[in-house]
A protein has these predicted regions:
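C-terminal non-catalytic regions of proteins with extracellular/luminal or membrane-system context
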Residues: 1-7, 41, 45-206
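Long, well-ordered, tryptophan-enriched scaffold segments
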Residues: 1-30
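A structural signal for beta-strand and strand-to-loop patches characteristic of beta-rich domains
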Residues: 27-36, 58-61, 206
């Protein structure tokens, strides 16, 4: 410390000053009164604004916004139906509500193909149960669930979707959190994802 000569008084004064400068800027120092009633509507508005500003459209080619005559949508991709609203660990927060992709499309006036939605919902439920068997490990509740792999629709189903809908939307997603290392598939497309994209594009671009 200072008495031993290993730390100068000037360094100590500088560090104390920095701590005090931070304290006087804090809400508590300025008389902030605690309230357990946050303005959730204002928070939601900021979140929406941040989401819009944080999105990056890599390529468009006149696809977006969707043409006014489009009303029926075939939605592909497990993430379209198993929506990722937050992360794992500290990224998993309490939220008043979540607007999923399907809800957002419906709110915008689009009709989601019911048969395709039923097919994906059934697949995701069965795969999630298979990949996440019940465990007696008390730490299991803190671990993120393994998400269902990508569903590759059959040629017959795709042909039906093309005839019943105006456009296809494909969603891919990755969850994120803490204390787990990334794997190759977190950065690249899996074989199932590539197969699904190729199959859907080939069917709808005929």
């Amino acid at each position: 410390g200072v008495r031993s000569g290993r730390l100068s008084e000037a360094d100590l004064d500088r560090n104390v000053r920095r701590v005090l400068e931070l304290i006087v800027k804090s809400p508590r120092f300025k008389g902030y009164e605690f309230s357990n009633k946050p303005d959730l509507k204002a928070h939601a508005a900021v979140t929406r604004q941040s989401a819009v500003e944080g999105m990056v459209l890599l390529e468009n080619n006149g696809v977006l916004p969707l043409a006014s005559e489009i009303s029926r949508v075939a939605v592909f991709g497990t993430t379209s139906y198993d929506f990722i609203a937050g992360g794992t660990g500290s990224g998993n927060v309490n939220r008043a509500y979540t607007v999923s992709l399907l809800e957002g499309l419906r709110n915008a006036g689009y009709a989601i193909d019911a048969e395709l939605e039923k097919t994906y919902t059934k697949y995701i439920k069965e795969e999630t149960e298979r990949l996440n068997p019940k465990s007696d490990d008390p730490m299991a509740m803190f671990m993120p669930k393994i998400r269902a792999g990508e569903f590759v629709p059959s040629a017959r189903l795709l042909d039906k979707m093309v005839r019943a809908n105006d456009v296809a939307i494909i969603t891919l997603g990755r969850n994120s959190g803490e204390f787990l290392d990334r794997k190759v598939a977190d950065f690249t497309l899996t074989e199932q994802e590539s197969g699904m994209i190729e199959a859907v594009c080939a069917a709808f671009h005929k």
